[in-house]
């Protein structure tokens, strides 16, 4: 039995010797490599925080002391130390979440995996502790240097630093990266701290001497206090000359570090000093992403930030290569567009490769801007670029557009800026769970005046609609696509005058008009499956892909007026979604055809594969067909209306599907 097998809670760490702790760190790394290579997950970040997490749990008393992980993908070690060692179904339906989860443990606090929010959580928790008479309880926020490129982190620091008595410990996990190397002025500032003062200021002798002289002089009456203030000012001046690290202390926060993030003794000493300091403290820990695993360290792109199933010995992906991904199709096309148009620029929020701007950047490095984890800034900066005669393409995961809605509405749309926003990982994404599903975007952008929204169904339509988007220079455009592999090409029977594609009429050649199916983006394959099933039950269908779902095309409304029932199949939330908008346009035009929105419920959906999540919420061909048959037979609302010369059925039985 290894040492890891004996750990059930953080208190089990307290009696371990230095040698045992080193052995435990080795066992944890071996465990992570073995298990995450079988399930996929965030391997590199967790290999980099093994000693740091051990030290945090040995010095602080969780859950009495609150530990908050920014983004949370580096919480695997924390899970192991808090009694969760069944990683066999990590990120799978019914298994452990890839992020902190309150449902799993009292040691978990923040479940959202959106970056830069941990310090605001720490600020709020510490205020609550202070106001409820529990100000002696610590709040520890573990935040990466990448997350400190986000403005929200600095809003929190501004508030934390204002109160010198709250026990907030900010542990900066500085590995010089988020996905890729961290960029920007603050990244340069942190880099300036690394080689100069090293671990000198975190050494025990330094702190002991400092505390001894401080007490001696402050207890020496007015002369001693004057001498202390003079020497303290001199010390600060020398520090600022020796290394430009005065920013945190200028804000009124004690700074400890840099500390070797893989040296347990140094980490524990630094954290104990922070714990015993009755005020806000920054502990600056230098770590290495992928530490202890050669394949991760050698991986230039992101040091195994997130992996699929891999060979644990080599780090190479197992199995055969899959079909081309949506992201790779976008990457090729935007690079081609950039070759043709010098006014097109790319903007990424610290995710150059994941969002597919790397090929563009390789060809035109001066025209791709990495703004850090700063989506709000990205959108407003894009508006400024548009004003200056450029056409910015902001590529971001769909879930992260949530963070920049005000900027989209008030800076981009209000000023009719020609900005294209490309949303990767739209819809249900699967194993990363509630905070990563890109299911909110279509409802959000419905209320943005003048915005154009495209949802391509296949690779050809993605290329086509991306080019159409960057041709619009007087309004914002959004192009959204799913995670993973692109499906087969779906050719249209015809394209209507306003750009709507008719994909199928079932039965073929039918002139009957029972059900109009409006498919949004990648749901077209599902829509065609439903049409075939309905056709087998004698119900005629017309399947259309609007391509551009906003503004609603007139032909959609016209087709709706000639059908008994409209269903809109989308992989966003039903509330305020595409179907809802189509209904509004139908009613405004006096079309009273019943419409059924088939989409996602307004719920936070747990992790699982995409197909598992869709089945869980009823977005399957079988369930949709069952519901539509019931609506056509008049046994379920909304009832399909009778067309002229038809009578509404009053009875009927559902077939077995």
Curated annotation (Swiss-Prot):
Please verify whether the record's keywords include Membrane.
no
Copy out the cofactor comment. Answer: Binds 1 Mg(2+) ion per subunit. Binds 1 thiamine pyrophosphate per subunit.
Any one Gene Ontology molecular-function term assigned to this protein's record: magnesium ion binding
EC annotation from Swiss-Prot or TrEMBL: 2.2.1.7
From its record, what is one biological process in GO terms?
A: terpenoid biosynthetic process
Q: Which cofactor names does the annotation list?
A: Mg(2+); thiamine diphosphate
Q: Which Pfam families match?
A: DXP_synthase_N, Transket_pyr, Transketolase_C
Keywords associated with the record: Isoprene biosynthesis, Magnesium, Metal-binding, Thiamine biosynthesis, Thiamine pyrophosphate, Transferase
- The residue stretches assigned to a coiled coil in this entry are none
Q: Does the keyword Transferase apply?
A: yes
Q: Which InterPro entries match?
A: Dxylulose-5-P_synthase, THDP-binding, Transketo_C/PFOR_II, Transketolase-like_Pyr-bd, Transketolase_BS, Transketolase_C, Transketolase_CS
- Can you state which reaction this protein catalyses? D-glyceraldehyde 3-phosphate + pyruvate + H(+) = 1-deoxy-D-xylulose 5-phosphate + CO2
* First-level EC class: transferase
SMART domains with a match to the protein in the record = Transket_pyr (SM00861)
Which CDD domains does this UniProt record tie to the protein?
TPP_DXS, TPP_PYR_DXS_TK_like
Q: Which residues bind Mg(2+)?
A: 145, 175
Q: Name one GO cellular component term.
A: cytosol
Complexes and interactors: Homodimer.
Family, per entry: Belongs to the transketolase family. DXPS subfamily.
Q: What does this protein do?
A: Catalyzes the acyloin condensation reaction between C atoms 2 and 3 of pyruvate and glyceraldehyde 3-phosphate to yield 1-deoxy-D-xylulose-5-phosphate (DXP).
Q: What is this protein called?
A: 1-deoxy-D-xylulose-5-phosphate synthase
User: What is the source species?
Assistant: Pseudarthrobacter chlorophenolicus (strain ATCC 700700 / DSM 12829 / CIP 107037 / JCM 12360 / KCTC 9906 / NCIMB 13794 / A6)
Q: What is the lineage of its organism?
A: Bacteria, Bacillati, Actinomycetota, Actinomycetes, Micrococcales
Q: Which gene encodes it?
A: dxs
